[in-house]
């Protein structure tokens, strides 16, 4: 729960001086990106902005405290303040902030600005006490916020120092409105108004001016002088002389003498006790101070001018002026040291009664009360964990003695899940092993099953599927039906293990079961994970259309539950890119891969390896080797600067080997082949991919026999495990092996099998990347006119893609080629005496590439009748009567010029 007072603008009090000159300057705040109010404590920053904000509706107010250095807490309150200003306009961001479903503050802010694009009225967001922020991530995120905020939004920041928000840049671009301590200092006229409101007997203008000069217009000093004068301890001028030259850091002695020593003992204790509360209401005050009628007491303190301010319009919440509050807390530690733990305990109990466990934990920690802290965690820790209050939980668990954790194994489990969420896998197992060793009878307890479920998750994450399977099975055997979270975890792990083993049908069933349980209990990240796994399994089985539909369900879940910022979102858009690539929808595949990189923008660059490999695949399918080389340089740099799972390395190696094949770089392939991992098995699509990389490198090096052994074994495994997409890929590579080895009939046989299987998988680009060798074979099959209709259609589509992206259309028939051809000693006399025009050479190249008359007309952007004329002329000049004769003639010319066709 969010504390309401942190989102409430301070109430404009009676008897305050209206700062007309400063309000006039602030009236143009909507013309600036940032309004920055800076000064030391006590110059009236908050009072000024509360005056300016009075009557404005489109304004959100966020009062910071030290706890707001936690990124998740900062995000929750900031978005809540925007919601306050827009009357709930940014619902998606609100849900993302509440559920912590964002990758970083900057990505959350980016989503916020998308929603605010539809908000056209002026909008203001006030952040008070920004000097309390010390987290550099928040500073960087707020710089991003200011750079990208909508034009109709003005950020108003109040701080005791110059914040790290790119101020100089804003100042140069005239996008900064600044008010500093010199402007905030009271003028003579304002000081006179101030004393007239506060003192029963007015003082002369000259006297108030001298006082104002003595304290340099410092508002807090003026307030202290008025307080002293009312209490008749000193004359106003004497107080002013004493305060002259004093700043906020030297006020303690003065405040003791002039404030605390001049109130009765009951009020003194009330001030000291209540000061431990960062914000307070009637119930908190009554519990912490022991006084009845807490609200009445607060209002009385307010009337006495003891630096208490209202935090909301209802008058329910109060807080002390920061300067005075800090002073009181220091005095409380000195004067009430023995009582302080009990005071904090009372505060914790009251916050708990009002439903604010995070505030209660703050006071339980301050009280040093391990038992209270334990009880709060037992009741609320998992809720805080699910809301990503990880720093607070970690601090709390560290404060508990080990014996307390052992007595409450669920807290040990919580600590282990914290470690797991931070990828500290080794520490998880060490912690659980120590706990099991010391907790009596835990092996017969359900908690042991929960430990095993977590251990199973750690094992699969750490690349140990056998151990993960053993632990997941143990957990499922021992867990009661009602322990749904651990059952979801164990079921998911078991499904993933079976996926790794190639048992796809069983794995799919378990992942569907995981999805059902996760949806039932609102465990959305496991629901998303199970859908992603289902899609991968269906892709491996060759059911790409069903995989697509499963991905659509996952995208829908992301939208409904606002999971866009989870790293798993990158996984989903990446496998969508793989599917689009397979279907030769390259522009969409590239856009999806780039979206994945965007999702991971706030993570280490190494996390982008898989999406970068996907971008390279798109470049390779287009035949854009220059772009592929540029991207490969970055990929190889990432490979050399990170530790990756074997699946990631295999995917990265795939595009490297294909690039070497396309460029004929045998040296690079040979060097890689000497050092690359040779997996023991090939029983899943990850391992199949690595062995396919090895076979492709062997084919490039002319090592046909070992490559054939590899591919035949891969096919045997793929058929046995029904890895139909892998079988399709393997057949295409086997085709290239046979073709280059001169075994043309074998090459044609496996190509026909690959085309038939592609009716199921929909593969296009897997054929395209094999380039001209594939194009030649497809031309021959098309010319034979013996392919079934579906295969014929696919062959033509593949050929068009090859021609489009790899530029084989008429590359061999350009002007330079024709000139060399005509000067060749073996050129047919008919061509020498009746040379073709350049356009006719182009048409011959397109006929050779398998284009129909309509396609040639479209390619050359001329009428179909014109193409018929060109064809008739070139047939006559070549001395041929049919299209097949023209193709054979072109093939002979290419062979004569040294092209292997």
From Swiss-Prot:
SMART domains: HTH_LUXR. InterPro entries: P-loop_NTPase, Sig_transdc_resp-reg_C-effctor, TPR-like_helical_dom_sf, TPR_MalT, Tscrpt_reg_HTH_MalT, Tscrpt_reg_LuxR_C, WH-like_DNA-bd_sf. Keywords: Activator, ATP-binding, Carbohydrate metabolism, DNA-binding, Nucleotide-binding, Transcription, Transcription regulation. Residues 853-872 bind DNA. It holds the Pfam family GerE. Activated by ATP and maltotriose, which are both required for DNA binding. Positively regulates the transcription of the maltose regulon whose gene products are responsible for uptake and catabolism of malto-oligosaccharides. Specifically binds to the promoter region of its target genes, recognizing a short DNA motif called the MalT box. Monomer in solution. Oligomerizes to an active state in the presence of the positive effectors ATP and maltotriose. Belongs to the MalT family. This is HTH-type transcriptional regulator MalT.
